[in-house]
């Protein structure tokens, strides 16, 4: 399979969820910090209806139509770039949202600030469409 990806880190895809962002923003609010937008994390794909996406390592995310399937390989460890507002260049309180992400840890075994899942495409080339119905399987 031939694949190309620009500006990627270790994996070609970063998948995040609106539920994870909501949980993070609740934590930021509780810490009296400003909320952040999804563009702060620069995901390729954002899904809705998946709680605790960061805990889903080893699962597959696929289109109900069977057109494509992603393998969720590991939670994405976040660096200090997420402290920078992508629209203004303003730096948040130097430790946010990283400090809150650490507090929201998804596992006692792994330390750090994580948001989203690094993923690979397990199926043929495909078109991903806004509104696709997805299913999560282990």
Regions found by a protein language model. Give the residues of each.
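Metal-cofactor-dependent catalytic cores
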Residues: 1-138
